[in-house]
Amino acid sequence: MNKEELLEYIDNNSTAVTNFKDKVRADQQAKNKKRQPAKRWNDARIERQVDKFTDQFIGNIYDKLARAIKANNHTPKERWIKFIEENELLDDLEESVSMIDFEEE
């Protein structure tokens, strides 16, 4: 399983990615409102930031899962899914995302 497949699996079986994107988007929009009018970002730039944060989020999940599964390029997708389901990781992920609070720096 690669990162794109993991993203697709999580997105199809959980609301974690959607909720994460919503939180990042809200945070970026709040930060954007505090910028000087001439320096405010357009919606496309905000969406690029949302995508960047989401890629990092999925990358971190992927790396941790790969270590836990002891995966390599030949590890079947089914082994990933079995591990995710047996350990109820999607429920844990949704709970973790619900508790995320982006703090002002």
Model-found features: residue ranges?
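Short acidic DE-rich linear segments
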Residues: 4, 100-105
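Generic detector of leucine side chains in alpha-helical contexts
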Residues: 6-7, 65, 89-93
